[in-house]
Amino acid sequence: MRLTKYLLPFTLILMFSLLTGCTSNEKGETASKKQTDEKMITIGWPLDVGPLNPHTYLPNQMTAQAMVYESLVDYNDDGTITPKLAESWDISKDKTSYVFHLRKDVKYSDGTAFNADNVIRNFDAVLANRELHSWMGMVNHIKEVVKVDDYTIRLQLDEPYYPVLNELAFVRPFRFLGDNGFPEGDATQDAMKAPIGTGPWVLTDYKKDEYALFSRNDNYWGEKPLVEQIKVKIIPDSESISLAFENEELDLIYGRGIISLDNYTYLKDSGKYKTATSEPLSTKALLFNTQSGPLAELKVRQAIQYAINKEQMVDSITHGTEKVADTLFWDAIPYANIDLAPILYNPKKAQQLLEEAGWKLQKGEKIRSKNGQPLTLDLIYIATDAIQKPMAELMQGELAKIGVQLNLEGADVMVGLQKLMDNQVDINFWRTNGPPTDPHSFANESATPNANGVYEAKLGLPTAKEIDTKIHQLLVGTDEKERVQLYTDILTMFHDQALFFPISYETNSVIYQPYMKDFAPRASEYDIPYAQMEKEK
């Protein structure tokens, strides 16, 4: 990889060294490299950052979108909502009208204005594709977004929807593209001209599937980042990311599943590097497809959960960086601190349940059968996730002990999701969204077709329609006590029907070079705290 912007400074230094009689070009090169590296943080990432379209999803990487684009409000790790591009807001008594007062000191990275007209243009572009964004419940309730004055807008709902501010804080789709980034006709769902945002970083160099270089936004209205550039090196293989880090080609490795936990533990235990772990941010689980096949039976779903030694699996594979999950959400998630009895490891109970369900182990056979059909299940895991594959392989072995054949397939996340929604696979690895949208985004998606697979997976449950009704009631209701009870009912029904197999509460783990200053990883799926990163002088 050759970058002209780095060759020019080097050439000038070399010429100066020759003119002043310097006898060691090697020393000059070393000094130049050190100066450049001090101003840049390099991180490894398994996937290309994508086109950086703020209004669309994959292949856009959320971590990169969050560097360039900002929201009206911000969600903090303690669960509070604070101002961002909106300096304040007013909510009507009936909870259907939100008036946002925009900051007047904000410019886009190209120097153009951020104002009410631009905000409405972005809202209109997103709302032109309501179906695409239907997983976000607010989209289905926005009646109109109108300009009050140059720096004030009003968002009008058709009925109350309590998570409005949380959803506005999410990384997509309600973040803001500069006017010069819009395509002709404003159809941003198809393409955009350029990734122009108000955030602290601007994309300045990019080579697909190799790297993306972000430079500090000189027009940024907030506190400037401590370093000048962030380089994201695209390295699909987790082993190669670890090796690049050991060779000091990377300054840090950040996030869940980027490298194997074995490699993380090896690097941590070497004593050469710094490490940190965030608070829990999401839950890793299996999602069972109840539409047809063996998993349409409750006892089969329960048997699978009893058959897997979850505690041993989580400890051995995550090396303590994740906590065993017995419920779908950890207790600190709003409305999720519910007393639910966990399903504990009990292979004898698992076999008993399968016998009761009519799945018998015939003499000389290793796989149970019923009415001539073998008890065979298909599981899809994300091929690029360094943790899901070893977990899938361990579960494959555990289920074989009770007479269940588990077939494994590694695939792209969207391939697995589509197969589940099309009723072509039995089990998917699945995870909650985490802050700032849990648990309400989970609830909304669970009642929305073609969202995250839960709606389709639960179609075989006897309580499916009742769950959908309760979800609608809690999202539009204004009574807090009623909302608490509805969440309790919904989460209890999912738990009792064994639709999910909670595995672990995930965290962001970070390992960084000793010359990096300490920083705290955030309990966020997408917000990497680049602005706080700095190298020792």
Regions found by a protein language model. Give the residues of each.
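N-terminal lobe/hinge region of extracytoplasmic solute-binding protein
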Residues: G44-K93, D124, I196, S524-Y526
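Surface-exposed binding/hinge segments that line
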Residues: G137-G181
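Append "and occasionally in soluble cytosolic enzymes with long acidic Gly/Pro-rich linkers
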Residues: A296-G397, K535-E536
